[in-house]
């Protein structure tokens, strides 16, 4: 049987993550992930700057019509001495093989199953 692709997710905000100056303290921005679909999904966050950007929770499972708030934190840094072009967070998601799965498993993303991605660029307002 062919595997069905994961349905769309929604994020709020939908387009980007914004951090405002000053950058001398840790700042946190919240992103809501919504699974409007009919299947349980596993999700995982990645970033281009893992030493500066952290996500909590970094992964999880969402049932149909469920949502979760994810805290995206930016550690203190000097924007004049660091390249911030291309900074982004990416949320990846896939259908869970077991419709009753409650715990995230990294192996869902490592096989030949279908994984979808949504990039959220990071904007730094100096």
UniProtKB/Swiss-Prot annotation:
Keywords: Acetylation, Cell projection, Cytoplasm, Cytoskeleton
Cellular component GO terms, alphabetical: cytoplasm; cytoskeleton; pseudopodium
Keyword Cytoplasm carried by entry: yes
Pfam family, any one: Motile_Sperm
InterPro entries: Ig-like_fold, MSP_dom, Nematode_MSP, PapD-like_sf
Domain MSP: from-to ranges: 8-125
Subcellular location: Cell projection, Pseudopodium; Cytoplasm, Cytoskeleton
Tissue specificity remark: Sperm.
Functional description taken from the UniProt entry: Central component in molecular interactions underlying sperm crawling. Forms an extensive filament system that extends from sperm villipoda, along the leading edge of the pseudopod.
Name of this protein: Major sperm protein 1
């Amino acid at each position: 049987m062919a595997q069905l692709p994961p349905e769309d997710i929604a994020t709020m905000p939908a387009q980007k993550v914004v951090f405002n100056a000053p950058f001398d303290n840790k700042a946190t921005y919240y992103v809501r992930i919504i699974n409007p679909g009919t299947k349980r999904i596993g999700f995982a966050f990645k970033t281009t700057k893992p030493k500066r950007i952290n996500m909590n929770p970094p992964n999880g499972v969402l049932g149909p019509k469920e949502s979760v708030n994810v805290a995206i934190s930016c550690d203190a840094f000097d924007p004049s001495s660091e390249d911030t072009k291309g900074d982004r967070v990416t949320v990846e998601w896939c259908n869970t093989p077991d419709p009753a799965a409650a715990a995230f498993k990294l192996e869902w993303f490592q096989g030949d199953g279908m994984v979808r991605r949504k990039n959220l660029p990071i904007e730094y307002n100096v």
